[in-house]
Amino acid sequence: MKKIIPTNLFKLISILFILTPFFAWSAPQETLIDRVVAVVNDNIILKSELDAEVNLAKQDLQARNIPVTNPEELASKVLDKIILERLQLQRINQLGIKIADDELFSQIQEIAKQNNLTVIELRDRLNMSQKNGFESFRERIRQQMLFQKLREVEVLSKTQVTEDEVSNFIQRQALVQSDVEYHLGHIMVSLPESATPDQRDASKQKAQEILQKIRTGGDFSQMAVRYSEGSKALQGGDLGWLGIDQIPTFFNDALNQLEIGETSDVIRSPVGFHIIQLQGKRNKNSQIVKQYHLYRFILLSEDAQNKQQPSPTLVKLAESLNSLESFKQLNEKYSDIPASVNANGNLGWQTAKEMSPEYYQAIEALQPGHAAKPFATEKGWVILFLDGIRDQDLSLKDKRKQAMQTLRMKKANESYEIWLRRLKDEALIDIRLEDPEIMKKQPSHEEANAN
């Protein structure tokens, strides 16, 4: 599964607030009556939920040094984001999509690794930031993984790529700077699925007006927050660093004409009109990678993380494992452990970047044919066996496989916005953001504290 989670630790901590009550301060119970701001099919969205999401969006924009110039527009944009999330969750329930615990744990390991932390360190930091912070974080990550699976089922699985397209893609990649990454800003003005000529003209005119504001000194990020209907609008339109194979094909011609800091003309696509800004350009480090073939065995223990070191008996056991055959015999030695725990013990070939920090630390100085010193995880004690080390480059077969995956993802990205729009168009949505009927006025912090 493609990684979907932001790796900045501030974001990891700040998203916890989405899962906690907005009114955390003490106030008389009768003043805390909530109200409905939207109904999505048979699901309601409360004002407290919207307020929590708006606060999170403000924190993220503040971290990017993007001022909030229009709070009402921000709230409306955030509400639209929540509505899309609810629609996707409803579809997930209809399809019976689930996330297994081991999938979730692997994703959290990846997040910890990208923040140069172990899972234990990540857990401790989140719990220090908020009570039960790690558990709330786990559920948020589970939800984002569900969204990713839904996207794979509804969009990616239906995206077809021909062998000719793969061959042409590989040939084109040989002609372009495939080792270059681009940092892009993006603004989108969307079109209805069956847009009339008048609607197309109105959307194009709006995009032209936004572009004019940017070219006369308007800040691109602020324009994105205010006007963009793209998925990254609340991040100032920041698409991050992308390889040429990750950029929508309809951006290519415009991108080739841009210098750093320049903004494109309005670009037409099937989903609307776009403006991109080239905010950076850099070379990727291309090199032969070292891969490690690992096997893993987990000894279940509820208190492993509370102990500083494994027992001498356990260390001696690991030191005695000097062949893959002896390592595999652990399944017989510990037959009381459920088979499912170690069913996926062959981890295959992995690079250092693909491993969690604790895994690489355990095998970094290890010679092939030996087991690493046991270390503690959430599930218990882990013993890794290093079966081999190799230097690996992509073969032509691997390149075709990678090209196929890249093209499918590229096509899926181009059709994702259409699918989301259709999902929204088919739903019954009642927005009550401007409804003045609030049963009791929310007190200010000062009023609440005075009570």
Swiss-Prot record:
In the record, which residues are listed under signal peptide? 1-26
Q: What is this protein called?
A: Chaperone SurA
SUPFAM superfamilies referenced in this protein's UniProt entry, alphabetically: FKBP-like (SSF54534), Triger factor/SurA peptide-binding domain-like (SSF109998)
**EC primary class:** isomerase
Q: What is the lineage of its organism?
A: Bacteria, Pseudomonadati, Pseudomonadota, Gammaproteobacteria, Thiotrichales
Q: Which InterPro entries does this entry report, sorted A to Z? A: OMP_Chaperone_SurA (IPR050280), PPIase_dom_sf (IPR046357), PPIase_PpiC (IPR000297), PPIase_SurA (IPR023034), SurA_N (IPR015391), Trigger_fact/SurA_dom_sf (IPR027304)
User: PANTHER family per the record?
Assistant: CHAPERONE SURA
Q: Where is the PpiC domain?
A: 179-280, 290-388
Record's PROSITE patterns? PPIC_PPIASE_2 (PS50198)
**Molecular-function GO terms, alphabetical:** peptide binding; peptidyl-prolyl cis-trans isomerase activity; unfolded protein binding
Q: Which GO biological process annotations does it have?
A: Gram-negative-bacterium-type cell outer membrane assembly; protein folding; protein stabilization
- Matches recorded under Pfam families: Rotamase, SurA_N
Task: Provide the domain comment.
Answer: The PPIase activity resides only in the second parvulin domain. The N-terminal region and the C-terminal tail are necessary and sufficient for the chaperone activity of SurA. The PPIase activity is dispensable for SurA to function as a chaperone. The N-terminal region and the C-terminal tail are also required for porin recognition.
Explain the purpose of this protein: Chaperone involved in the correct folding and assembly of outer membrane proteins. Recognizes specific patterns of aromatic residues and the orientation of their side chains, which are found more frequently in integral outer membrane proteins. May act in both early periplasmic and late outer membrane-associated steps of protein maturation.
EC number, as in UniProt:
5.2.1.8
Intracellular or extracellular location(s): Periplasm
Where is it mostly found? periplasm
Keywords, A to Z, come to: Chaperone, Isomerase, Periplasm, Repeat, Rotamase, Signal
> Record's Gene3D superfamilies?
3.10.50.40, Porin chaperone SurA, peptide-binding domain
Catalytic activity field:
[protein]-peptidylproline (omega=180) = [protein]-peptidylproline (omega=0)
Q: Can you name a GO cellular component term? A: outer membrane-bounded periplasmic space
